[in-house]
Amino acid sequence: MDKIAVLIPCYNEEKTVEKVVSDFKRELPEAVIYVYDNNSTDRTAEIAEKCGAVVRHEYVQGKGNVIRRMFREINAECYIITDGDDTYPAECARKMSEAVLERNVDMVVGDRLSSTYFKENKRAFHNTGNRLVRKSINLLFHNDIKDIMTGYRAFSYEFAKTFPILSEGFEIETEMSIHAVDKNKIVRAHV
């Protein structure tokens, strides 16, 4: 069993995957870095492998399908999931893994929304949708998760192995948040 597994679902990320793998190797040299290629038509898998990542493939399209396979195939005390597009800073990974390994936190949620994310994101209604979903889930479950839809998280072994993934696509992030608060898992935002 790996102590820490960094899981990177990828679809056509040849421009950024090298940096993402290198950054996480630098911050967590003891971790095993896994890149799951989801039918990329570019050189994502080749570049990731050259950087030292363990490359595997999920041929059923969709991020939820990729994460389902990751959690099924990999055994680790701590899982860190990040996107292959270099959205999230690897510098936070150590604190996120320590929360899982040393403080028995089930899920650590990376927070895009406290930074410049809302200012930089120009997609119509995207920010409004994020706020609406976040407020609704936090109200229903009496919680205060800052970023329901982030792709940057850390998980315990128990969470990963008991999470019944139903989503096929990007709705997986919301499903993870709802599962955690519904099952009274210990959830923390990273520092």
Tell me what each language-model feature is:
Residues K3-A5, V32, E175:
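Cell-envelope/extracellular polymer assembly enzymes that use nucleotide-activated donors
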Residues N12-R26:
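Short, well-formed alpha-helical segments that are part of the catalytic scaffolds
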Residues D37-A45:
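A conserved acidic beta->alpha catalytic loop
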Residues Y59-E73, A90-F170:
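Acceptor/aglycone-binding surface of glycosyltransferases and processive sugar-polymer synthases
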Residues Y79:
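Short aromatic/hydrophobic "clamp" motif used to bind/position activated sugar donors
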Residues D83-Y88:
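The conserved acidic donor/metal-binding loop of glycosyltransferases
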Residues F159-F163, G169-I186:
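A short, conserved alpha-helix in the catalytic core of glycosyltransferases
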Residues A189-V191:
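Conserved small/polar residues in nucleotide/adenosyl-binding loops
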